[in-house]
A protein has these predicted regions:
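Glycine-rich, acidic/polar active-site loops that bind/position phosphate-bearing ligands
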Residues: 4-261
Length: 261
């Protein structure tokens, strides 16, 4: 019996210094600087993906699959369809089991805005590095389990020219030393520090696009009518902006970064 495991490593130079191109070190420095100011991010990620016909995917062609549990082609565009979730119920059940074994905190799953498109949400965690690790492990699990169930999976930003793209949505709130959410001041609009965080994030957005949209396909996603951002903007519960402030209770006030894909 072949036993396999995985290790998420951190890169160091031969002299023991952190490797400058390791993104975990970059994120660790950011988290450390926030902690020096008594601030602690709480992060949750949402990942969108398509399930595809595996034979055509192997040939380099994207085409919706036959849903493995119902035998019905994934043809409809019905956001939040329960029937589409029924069609992949065994896939989702195995996802839950595999992620539990890896301590990846799944939150929920939904069918999305195109045929064969789904989203899986991860729970909020107080360690941004762990949140990033969870996303990587989730991607690997989705692709591997999809193959086991006779379909392929892709997180490509825009696999179909005329359908919605896939994004990575990052939800962030920040707590102070007392555990209070600094984005909440009891008002419906949120605190001044929330608006300051929005302003700073938008100011850095042009330079950040090399990471958030790293290839030409990423920009094919950024078109009108697909719940993807078109400008460095923000809004309350608006799904076409770069930074969305979701409807939530005051203590859960957060910023959703919707650009990456």
């Amino acid at each position: 019996m072949c036993i396999r495991d995985r290790v998420l490593g951190i890169l160091y130079e031969l002299d023991g210094e952190p490797c400058p191109v390791d993104p975990r070190h970059v994120l660790r420095r950011v988290v450390s600087r926030l902690a020096d100011d008594g601030l602690y991010p709480v992060v949750a990620l949402e990942l969108e993906f398509y399930l595809l016909d595996s034979a055509l995917a192997d040939a380099g062609e994207a085409h919706p699959p036959v849903l493995p549990d119902t035998g019905r082609p994934a043809e409809r565009t019905q956001v939040y369809s329960l029937a589409d979730l029924d069609g992949v119920s065994s896939f989702l059940a195995e996802m839950e089991s595999v992620c539990a074994a890896q301590r990846v905190p799944l939150g929920g799953a939904s069918s999305e805005y195109a045929a064969g498109q789904f989203e899986i949400n991860l729970e909020h965690v107080g360690d941004p590095i762990a949140a990033a690790d969870h996303a990587i492990l989730l991607q690997r699990a989705v692709k591997g389990i999809a193959r086991k169930h006779g379909v392929a999976a892709t997180f490509m930003a825009k696999p179909y020219p005329d359908s919605a793209g896939n994004g990575l949505h990052t939800h962030v709130s920040i707590l102070d030393d007392s555990g209070r959410n600094i984005f909440d001041d009891g008002s419906e609009q949120g605190s001044d520090r929330l608006r300051q965080a929005i302003a700073g994030t938008l100011a850095l957005l042009p330079e950040s696009m090399a990471i958030f949209a790293p290839n030409a396909n990423s920009y094919r996603r950024l078109i009108p009518g697909n719940y993807a951002p078109l400008a460095p903007n923000w809004g309350y519960n608006h799904r076409d902006v770069s930074l969305r402030i979701p409807v939530s209770g005051h203590k859960n006030r957060r910023l959703e970064h919707r650009v990456a894909g």
